[in-house]
Design a protein with these regions (language model features):
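Ordered, small/hydrophobic-rich secondary-structure cores
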Residues: 78-79, 84-87, 91-93
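Beta-strand-rich solenoid/repeat architectures in extracellular/passenger domains
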Residues: 10-29, 42-58, 68, 72-81, ...
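Structural detector of coil-to-beta-strand junctions
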Residues: 1-3, 8, 29-34, 57-62, ...
Length: 167
C-alpha cells in the first residue's frame, strides 16, 4: 500500500505516482490511499501496471480533491466494490484504450468530478459509477448517462434499440 498521507489532518499534496509494475494491497486497505479529502495526487497506471485490492471496505485507489487518475493498465477490486474512489471534489478519472477496471468508480457526495473515456472511435464499454460525474468520451462516441457506457458501431444492428433507453 502507498499512503498519500498518514492521517486526514496530516495531508500530503502534489504527490505523483507512476506505476508500470504491481501495487497490491495484500491485507486490509487500498493499493493507493489518501487519508483525507485534500490529499491531492496524480496517479498514472501505465499499460503494464496492475493495481489490486480485495478489501470490500476500501477502494483500490482513493485520492482527494483536485486529483487525477489515468489508467492504461489494470485496476481491480471485487466487482461490487470501489476500484477508484474520489474522496475530494474536482477530481478527474481518465480511462484509456485497453485499460481494464474491475469495480465501481465512486464520486458519491463529491462535486466537480469528471470521467474521461479514451477507448477509440466506435468502441463499446461499460463502467459502473456512483455519484455525479461529468462524462466525456474523448473519441466522440455518445456516452449513455447512468453508468458510463457506449455502444460501438460494430453493434449497429442493436445500436438504435439500446440508445433509445438513454436518459
Amino acid at each position: 500500500t502507498i499512503r498519500i498521507s498518514k492521517t486526514a489532518s496530516n495531508n500530503t499534496t502534489g504527490m505523483t505516482i507512476t506505476n508500470s509494475g504491481t501495487i497490491e494491497a495484500t491485507t486490509d486497505g487500498s493499493a493507493i490511499f489518501g487519508a483525507g479529502a485534500t490529499a491531492t495526487a496524480t496517479v498514472t497506471n501505465n499499460s503494464s501496471g496492475i493495481m489490486t485490492n480485495s478489501d470490500s471496505s476500501n477502494a483500490t485507489i482513493r485520492v482527494g480533491a483536485s486529483s487525477s487518475v489515468t489508467n492504461s493498465g489494470t485496476i481491480k477490486n471485487d466487482v461490487g466494490n470501489d476500484a477508484i474512489k474520489l474522496y475530494g471534489n474536482n477530481s478527474t478519472i481518465t480511462l484509456k484504450d485497453k485499460g481494464i477496471v474491475v469495480g465501481k468508480l465512486d464520486a458519491l457526495l463529491r462535486t466537480g468530478s469528471t470521467l474521461k473515456i479514451n477507448h477509440g472511435a466506435g468502441q463499446s464499454y461499460f463502467y459502473e459509477t456512483e455519484g455525479s460525474f461529468t462524462l466525456e468520451d474523448l473519441d466522440g462516441n455518445q456516452v449513455v448517462k447512468g453508468s458510463a457506457g457506449s455502444v460501438g458501431q460494430g453493434g449497429s444492428e442493436t445500436l438504435d434499440e439500446l440508445l433509445s433507453y438513454k436518459s
